[in-house]
Amino acid sequence: DFYEMYPEKFVNITNGVTPRRWLLDCNPLLAAFITKKIGKQWITQFQEIRNLASFANDFDSQKEFLEIKKKNKQALFECLQHTNPIRDSTGKPVGHYSFLDETALFDVQIKRIHEYKRQLMNLIHVIMLYHELQENPEARRIKRMVFIAGKAAPGYEVAKQIIQLSYCISRRINQDSKTNQKLKLVFIENYNVSKAETIIPAADLSEQISTAGTEASGTGNMKLAMNGALTIGTEDGANIEMHQQVTDRFWPFRFGKTTLENDLIRHTGNYNPWDIYMQNNSIRKALDSLRDQSFTQTEEEHQALSNLYQSLLHKQAGCIPDYYFVLGDLLDYYRTQKKVEELFLKPQEWAEYALQNIAAMGNFSSDESIKNYAKLVWDIQPCLVDPKELEKIRIEYSEHDKCRIFPSSVNGSIKNSS
């Protein structure tokens, strides 16, 4: 009915995030670097961030960016040492994580735990890397710290099993002296905005790996890119528009089938994950470890991991196996992760790509979203704000901002407690 009355108001407006919180506030070191390079106009006119591209190929700017990233990684270490204990199978804290150093790739997937977001694919890849390193500790030339964070809906059993799998894998691989100098996994518990504000500035790689055609948009991908993380992702949600802005040249880690390809597979029924399992030894070994008690200590854990194995390979309760094509995209994901490693071995080039990604994020500010709503939907014009009124609101907002749960740190990466 509303569409018949106002068809012109039914338009697609891209999501955005505020660069004041998700860059200026949460990453003061990077914000100061940007201001030094291009001035402070970007803070309120985020399209100005495009001017950072002219520094992307500058050696000194690349070096400074990489040093900032290392400092933010150290801030994340300090945060997790106090807020993220190692837990046993009953959930009891039994110690604290030891981390790889700041030269490691920080591989980050932070979002709601859901099958379509495919944390499970990320974890299977971690198992594959672990098996490779067990056979040959020199199989990988970079160090990788994998961080996963998110919450599961209260009644979503499979999502909770994915969290259990994360804990089981991290417990095993982090204690394996043969591999733990090259690979570690941390599940960050009780994920919230305050923790995101410390994780995001430290990220090197942003995992945006949902099954193409399932993500409406997403904003975590924008926050991570604004802070200089490169995206490994499918053509899904806002990844598509980000890819267009960044261009193919600086978006090297695209992988996976498209929405149209996935729709065709579902329509024809031409997908059998069992064939993939049988034809690839590395995948088969990784999946078999979900049911052979390689990672479990209790029967409850064994049952949870066995259920995940079954969901990927066997029809259950009328649902087709591997509904979100985890195995269907896994090999392409694995190959693309090798491209990640190759680029990470060239830090100056990696920094150039990261700075180009930041510079391309102008369209993904919430200011831009609001401007487009005002123009295309609300039909209202911008008006000047009284500076005194603005300052009053800023003070009131600061006084009532109760979301900060971490104490202040020297570099400002961990926020003040209110």
Which residue ranges define each predicted feature?
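Short, conserved catalytic or adaptor-binding loops enriched in Gly and charged residues
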Residues: F2-M5, I173-N180, Q245-T247
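Catalytic binding pocket for nucleotide-activated donors in carbohydrate/polymer assembly enzymes
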Residues: Y6, T14-F55, P201-A202, I209-A354, ...
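Extended, charge-enriched "interface" segments that sit outside catalytic cores
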Residues: L23-F99
